[in-house]
Structure formats: C-alpha cells, structure tokens
C-alpha cells in the first residue's frame, strides 16, 4: 500500500475501534502508541548498527543488572555503559521486554500491564539532556489506558488491536519520515473532523497551515538559520509546515529551530511527538507546557530562572489561537508585550495573542496569525490597538478566508500578516472568501487558491474583486476600520431583468459590454454575432451561435495560440520526470513545473493560469506518490503487484482477506487498455450484452398487461421475473399468445445470461492473472511508456481542454 492507502486503512479501523470513546480522546491513544512504536523502532535500528542481534538484545537489553552475568564474564559497568550509550545517542532507553516488537511477539501473553510498565520505565530512563523533549510525554496515554475497557482483559484486547493496527507503519528510514508524518497528519485531521468544537484545540486545517507557511517561507528564503515559534502549538502541524516550506529554500532542515508553547497537556504532548517523529533533532526542539498569555516565553532553566534568563526573539511566529477567549488583563499595562499598543479587553484575548507574537519577532521577522474577523472593526480597546499597529507600521496584509473552513466553528476568520519593521506604510487586503471547494460539511482551500493568495501577498498585487493595496491615509479616513468589504468588493453583479428586452426582444448593450474580456480577445467577433437595434439594444444575427463562434478566425487564432504555447510540453515533462526519476526532488518539482506552465501562458488571454495550476496539482499528487515509491524501493517496484486486501464479514466480525491483485505502481486497468486490449474488448462485449439483457427484462415487464404482473412468474414488488415460474407458465401455455412470446423471449435471454456470466467470470479471472504476469515481466521501456500514459497524458489532456471550457462558458453567457 502507498501512504494514502495505509493511512486510510488505519483511520477506518481506528474509527470503528474507538467505539464510544470521543474522537478527541481516542486520538491521544492511537497517536501515543504510534509515537512509542517510532521510538522503539528507532532504538532497534540504532542497536542493529551497533551489532546487537536478536539473541543479544533478549539477553542483555535490560534496565536491571542480573548478577548471573558476572559468571559469564560480563561486567556490570559494561551493561550500564550500554544503557548510557543508548540514552546519550537517543535521549531515552527502552528495555527488551518493553520494545514494541516484543509486545507483538508475545501474542496471547501480551497484557495491558506490559504497557503500563513500559511507559513507567520510559519516564524513568530519559537522558537528563533530553528531559524537555521527552519528560511526561506519555502521561496522557498512561492515564487513558483505563478508558480503553472496563477491566484488564478488555483493555488488553483493545490495546492489542491497536498495536496490530499500526504495526505496518514504516519508521526505518529518512524517506519514511514522510510516510509516518503523512499518516500522523492524516489521522489528526480525521479525528479533528469528528471532534466537533474540540477540534480547534489541536488542529489547524492543512491548507490554512500551508498558506501561512508559503507566505512565511518567501520572506525567510534567503536565510541560513532560522528560529520559528508557535505560542499555541496544538498538534505542532503548523510549525512543521513552516519548517518544511522554509527548508525547500535552505536545503538543510537541521538549521531550523522550533519553539512551541501549549496550554493543554495532552495537546502539548502531541506537539512534541509530531516534531520528534518528523526527524527534527532534539536540540532543535524547545517546548513548554504553559499559559502563553500568563507565562511569557523568555527561556530559562527552571533550576536557575535568573541566571539562565534569555528573552526569545525569532525569525517567524505562526499561530492559530483560540478565538475571542476570555483572559485576565489586570496589571498587564506594563507588560512589555502590550505597553506600546494597549491591552486587549477581558472577554476577547485575540489582540493579546497577536501582540505576544509580535513582541517575539526579530526586527526583520514575519508573523502570520489566524483571528476572527471581528478584530478588523471592533471598537474600544481593540480599536486603539488596531490604530497603534497601523501607525507603527506593523500590519503588512490581511487575508479574508472562506466561511466554515475550520472544524467545529463557522466563525468568519482572517489571516493577518505582520512584520516588526517595514519600508512600506500601506496594507494589502485580500478577499479570498470565494475560492474554495466543499468537502463534507466544511469548505477547503484548493491548491490553486493557496497559490493565488500566496502570489498576491508576496508580490503585493492589485486584482479587481480580490485584492487591493490600501494607503495608510485611506485607513485613517476610515477611522482605522479594516473591515474587508470597505476596501475590496468581491460581490457578484446582481442578476437583473430588462423589462424592455423581455417585452420587445433584443439584448441590452450593458450585458454585451460585461463580456469585454472576450471582445478584447476576439476583436472582430462582436460584429459577427450582433446587430445594433439602437444605442441601447442589439440583436443576435446568427442562427447557430456555437457554430459562428467556433468558426470565427479570432477564436481559432486563440485556440491555435494556446496549443502553440504548449508545443513541446509533453517532451519537457518527459525530460523532467521520466529521465531522472530517482533524482527528482519531489518537494521542489511541482513548483518547477508550475513556473513552466505560468511561463507558457504569458500573453494568452482569458486563461486563468491558476486553473491550469490546479490541473497540475491534481495530477502531481499521484505522480509524487509513485516517485516516492520508485525512489525508496527502486525501479523494480514498478513491476511489482500487491495483494488486493478487502474487508469481509466473517462470524459477525470484519476480517481482511485477499481479493486478487493490484499494481504497486502501474495500474491493472492501464495495462489492460494498452497491452491486453483484445481480451478487454471481449469482456466489455459480454458486459454490454448482459446490460442489454437486463434492459430487455425491464422492457418486457413494461409490456406485460397489469393483470399478468399479479401472476407467479413476476415477483411481489413487480420488478423482476421469477424464473422457475416463467418456465412453468411457458410449459402450461395458459397465457395469451402475446404474453407467451414475451416469456419465451426473456427465458431464452435468461439462459444466455447464465452462460455469459460464467464466460465473464472465467475471462475476467484469466485477464486478471494475465495482467499480473504482464506487469511482473514488463521491460523497462514498457514501464516508461506506461508511466508516461499514467503521469503525463492526463496532465496534457487536462490542460488541452481549457480553451474548450473557456469557449463553452462564453457561449453559455451569451445564451442565458
């Protein structure tokens, strides 16, 4: 399975296994066990490098020293040195009996007590230099074990199911951090979708996080070392996305230091787990479990607060704090975070969080923060803070997000971008509320929405109905009210009906003028299509609108110009992807392809380059998965097939069983369409004939007189024939001639249907086996050809359809 399939399988099983436990709670247990497996596997990998085999681990990998070892010429100091070496290198020690693999090998002897003992031992054996990273990290899991069942037996059963569910997650290589991280993020997002209002406590939707990350990364792209900080870190995903985006420019991710603070202990533990599992060095992880507004961050060691006091200033702060949370503003006027700007009101801490973030920025730093849109226009203390932020030139951009984009709340939200020092005095305002797709109950930013917003913010673009750079004087004139509709009107033109046109015919000139972009692109077309009736109205003078438009030389020039712009693009993609599969930098390649598409579209009218980018992104997601497999498993993985596992009920329980095979990289259906087309065509012919027979049954039922449908040869709900009774009726010949003819026809078809179904089963089975053999014996050249058709052809086809879509939309606007 690829990482998406594995993540989906684990989620589906976990969601069933949690039973009555709240999603918000159950996530802490499964994610805790995944983290324990990660640490355990990591230790075993370290031991393997040190030459420890399984027998040696079983004998000597123990916390306690065994006296009998003296008789075997092993000294206690050697044993203690082994433990010390593991702790020094990893930051912790897990004994043999507490390894995740040992739990699995115990089988029916495994018990919940094994987990309790292991977690207790882990806390005891953390290296002192790694206390801040690992101390109490399993407390939430340890205290929650009792909630997994009413007694020891049921708890043991639940935990056993859990550890067997996650045992296949790979954790043994640098590339696999992405698999592990993907699954971890996938589970968090799905638990958030099922956690209602509590989701906001630990999760920022990936797309929002990615948008914030891209804006920050562009600002920091030329730096060689950075510090980033999230004062309300939740699961840590926002920090991780920032780090990943910045690392694309820096190259060395080990030069990024992560700071995080989180109030809730269980969520704080998620932050640390997530950071560690992404391969971030422990020395680059600095976290604190505390109240951000009450306990500001200057770093200090608890054993010597005064001597180790060090104010924290970072390159970037990112946060998604709780919206309009109550807080205690008493005696905060002299707090250096708020002294310059003012103190947020008691009932709404939004600006308290913002000012906290701003305080910790370096002079050349950048911050992004998610806030309820009320911060843009509410008065009182908040109005004064807003004024001071504007006058001190800190607000760089405001981005209005789509409604209902966060789990558990429909509150309208914004992202505010601020900088400690700016050369400009204006503010960019972006209304991105209209760009999204509906996914389940929530709205979700598409890849094209994220790129469009990022480009507008980083390039500070004015785009009608989307973005506008506002001068400070205009903001002053509006009394520092930053409500987005005051500056950017993204509303659609209201639909109107022209009474004169309705009564006397004709098309209002205003409606024709609304299509100005098309007339600019097709300068001679308007005269071909319309004839002026008077100054205010025109009439359509062509009988076939579509034919007239498609036959226009202007339109043909547009289509041909578009095609010419992508001349050689297939070959370009082949060079970029096919010829250097193992060397493609997966994290950077999509941006490279995107730049090429945007370059080719320069000067092409009407085409929205971001629509083209969305087509690329849709295809890239599949390409990236395949490239990951090829780069981690080798090119031979393209000639591999995997068991197709499905879930079936057996004795009332879901059981996973094999149902044929699937291509590991190359899909069965692609091989059948391109290399086994004769067999596939024969099967499709049988399927077509079976569909005809089924349709014939329905027609025959319709032809039967109503009184005949009450007879035994039709079922009770009059939707199908009863075949044994049909044969009896034919034999008895007690129906009229017309009905008898119908029965004979459907009976004959039924006999043919039985034979065809057997043929279909036999031929489908044979084709399936033949496809398996074909994939396993593919030549390298055949693999390249198939991957070209899987990766590149859909992208070329999708881009090729854009002009057709534009013309169709143009025709529809004239016709409406």
Feature annotation, model-predicted:
Residues 16, 22-38, 345-418:
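Conserved Class I SAM-dependent methyltransferase catalytic core
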Residues 41, 277, 323, 363, ...:
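Short, well-ordered loop/turn and helix-capping segments at boundaries between secondary-structure elements
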Residues 313-314, 348-350, 364-366, 392-396, ...:
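Active-site lining segments that contact anionic ligands and/or coordinate catalytic metals
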Residues 415-455:
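Conserved P-loop NTPase
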């Amino acid at each position: 399975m690829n990482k998406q399939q594995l993540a989906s399988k684990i989620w589906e099983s976990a969601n069933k296994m949690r039973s009555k436990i709240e999603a918000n709670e159950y996530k802490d247990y499964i994610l805790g066990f995944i983290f324990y497996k990660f640490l355990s596997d990591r230790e075993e990998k370290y031991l393997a490098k040190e030459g420890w085999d399984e027998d040696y681990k079983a004998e000597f990998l123990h916390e306690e020293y065994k006296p009998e070892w003296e008789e075997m010429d092993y000294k206690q100091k050697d044993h203690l040195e082994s433990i010390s070496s593991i702790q020094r290198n990893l930051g912790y020690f897990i004994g043999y009996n507490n390894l995740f693999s040992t739990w699995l090998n115990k089988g029916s002897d495994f018990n919940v007590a094994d987990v309790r003992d292991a977690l207790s031992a882990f806390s005891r054996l953390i290296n002192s230099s790694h206390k801040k990273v690992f101390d109490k990290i399993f407390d939430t899991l340890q205290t929650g074990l009792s909630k997994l069942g009413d007694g020891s037996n049921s708890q043991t059963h639940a935990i056993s199911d859990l550890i067997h569910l996650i045992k296949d997650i790979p954790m043994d290589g640098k590339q696999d951090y992405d698999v592990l991280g993907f699954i971890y993020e996938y589970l968090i997002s799905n638990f958030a979708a099922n956690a209602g209002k509590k989701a906001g406590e630990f999760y920022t939707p990936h797309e929002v996080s990615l948008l914030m990350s891209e804006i920050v990364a562009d600002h920091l792209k030329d730096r060689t070392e950075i510090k980033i900080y999230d004062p309300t870190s939740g699961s840590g995903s926002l920090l991780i996305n920032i780090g990943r985006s910045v690392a694309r420019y820096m190259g060395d991710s080990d030069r990024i230091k992560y700071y995080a603070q989180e109030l809730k202990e269980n969520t704080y533990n998620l932050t640390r787990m997530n950071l560690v599992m992404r391969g971030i060095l422990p020395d680059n992880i600095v976290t604190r479990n505390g109240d951000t507004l009450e306990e500001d961050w200057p770093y200090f060691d608890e054993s010597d607060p005064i001597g180790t006091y060090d104010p924290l200033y970072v390159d970037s702060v990112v946060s998604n704090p709780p919206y309009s949370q109550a807080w205690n503003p008493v005696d905060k006027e002299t707090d250096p975070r708020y002294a310059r700007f003012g103190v947020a009101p008691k009932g709404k801490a939004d600006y308290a969080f913002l000012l906290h973030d701003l305080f910790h920025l370096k002079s050349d730093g950048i911050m992004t923060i998610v806030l309820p849109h009320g911060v843009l226009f509410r008065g009182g203390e908040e109005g004064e803070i807003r004024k001071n932020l504007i006058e001190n030139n800190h607000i760089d951009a405001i981005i209005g997000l789509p409604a209902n984009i966060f789990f558990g709340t429909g509150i309208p939200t914004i992202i505010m971008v601020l900088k400690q020092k700016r050369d400009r005095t204006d503010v960019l305002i972006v209304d991105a509320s209209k760009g999204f797709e509906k996914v389940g109950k929530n709205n979700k930013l598409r890849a094209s929405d994220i790129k469009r917003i990022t480009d507008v913010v980083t390039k500070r673009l004015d785009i009608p109905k989307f973005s506008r750079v506002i001068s400070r004087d205009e903001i002053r004139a509006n009394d520092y009210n930053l409500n987005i509709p005051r500056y950017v009107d993204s509303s659609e033109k209201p639909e109107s009906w022209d009474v004169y046109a309705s009564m006397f015919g004709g098309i209002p000139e205003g409606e024709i003028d609304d299509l100005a972009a098309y007339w600019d692109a097709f300068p001679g077309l308007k005269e071909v299509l319309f004839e002026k009736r008077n100054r205010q109205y025109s009439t359509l003078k062509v009988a076939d609108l579509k034919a007239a438009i498609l036959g226009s030389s202007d339109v043909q020039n547009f289509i041909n110009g578009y095609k010419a712009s992508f001349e050689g693009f297939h070959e370009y993609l082949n060079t970029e992807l096919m010829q250097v599969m193992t060397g493609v930098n997966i994290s950077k390649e999509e941006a490279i392809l995107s730049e090429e598409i945007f370059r080719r579209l320069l000067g092409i009218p009407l085409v929205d380059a971001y629509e083209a980018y969305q087509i690329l992104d849709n295809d890239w997601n599949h390409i990236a998965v395949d490239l990951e497999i090829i780069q981690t498993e080798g090119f031979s993985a393209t000639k591999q097939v995997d068991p197709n596992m499905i879930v079936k009920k057996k004795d009332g329980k879901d059981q996973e069983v094999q149902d044929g095979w699937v291509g590991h990289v190359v899909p069965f259906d692609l091989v059948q369409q391109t290399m086994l087309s004769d067999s596939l065509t024969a099967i499709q012919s049988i399927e077509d004939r079976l569909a005809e027979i089924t349709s014939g049954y329905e027609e025959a039922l319709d032809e039967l007189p109503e009184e005949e449908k009450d007879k035994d040869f039709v079922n009770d709900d009059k939707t199908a024939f009863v075949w044994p009774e049909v044969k009896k009726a034919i034999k008895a010949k007690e129906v009229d001639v017309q009905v008898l003819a119908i029965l004979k026809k459907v009976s004959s078809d039924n006999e043919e249907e039985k034979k065809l179904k057997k043929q279909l089963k036999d031929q489908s089975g044979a084709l399936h086996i033949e496809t398996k053999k074909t994939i396993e014996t593919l030549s390298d050249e055949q693999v390249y050809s198939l991957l070209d058709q899987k990766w590149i052809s859909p992208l070329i086809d999708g881009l090729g359809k854009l002009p057709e879509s534009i013309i169709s939309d143009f025709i529809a606007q004239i016709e409406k």
